[in-house]
């Protein structure tokens, strides 16, 4: 039996409006090869998750109707805002909003497959939680480290995708170890995000991540600009090309360099042997006046030309946002602020609800609007990119 477009729209609308995640299995390996579009079941609605998150997170985050860098959080770093006047944060939102989807209504797609392969691990959609640290100084300390890891990783795994553990710039090594221990105890599938510390400190943290069974590593190269916030006695620094090569060789795990915003630096990362890059301005939190990631992604993808895995972040809130980034050439995306809010509003169920919401929205966009059977079928003909010329 297949879904007609009308039934698909009705079913997806009901699933998004009605309820949160309920009884999906926590066993990651049991995810189907072609996720179906089904109503979400449970007791908590997405609006309830947002309301609870707002109650918990003010004044760190106000859970605005649109997370666009223009709310009360402007300039709040630490916190949820962007640096300075939050123009980098705003540029992420504006550049993504400016990309438009081309509607295609004559095709034979009925049930799309939103899943992708992420370095040998099948995940339900091209969305992974962004590594996020600072449960105290960024989020207000309303969740313990264990609660936050359980919420992010447990919820993402319930939805069939990967969670994340961060090496926060203001966190001592003990906190990082505690996060990894929680991940290991529960057998969560996740990635780990590291800061550009001294080489020996990064490699030490790589070893700990390997022991915890993580899937891939990222290093936030752009966090070198946040040295003033590093824990006393610890160092973050810019990395040379030779240092990048050393880090790639230091681990057998896939290593992606994050914070790449220009084609030439993408090429440097490839030449250093990186498994991938993450196009990111750190949510506008490291430099106040960067362009938005959607504005630079197409040219970076052109430069990479399939030579490495390309990820991107920047104000992802909906499944249509995911399709836009993938259409511009990203292999996968990272979502940060929205997952953190979902964790505070509903713990693992809230995170799974948000993840499944995005997956359902992506599926609707693929089948009803753009006619893509699988994620690999999403391409640039499906989007209108302002000011872009190949």
Which positions does each model-derived feature cover?
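N-terminal functional module of multi-domain proteins
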Residues: 86-172, 179
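N-terminal export signals
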Residues: 2, 7-29
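Hydrophobic faces of well-ordered beta-strands that scaffold small-molecule active sites
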Residues: 127-130, 163-165, 190-194, 217, ...
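Conserved, mostly hydrophobic/aromatic
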Residues: 129, 156, 219, 277, ...
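Alpha/beta enzyme core
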Residues: 199-310, 328-330
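Active-site mouth loops of central-metabolism enzymes
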Residues: 133-143, 193-199, 256-259
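An N-cap/entry alpha-helix motif that binds or orients negatively charged groups
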Residues: 36-124, 378, 387-389
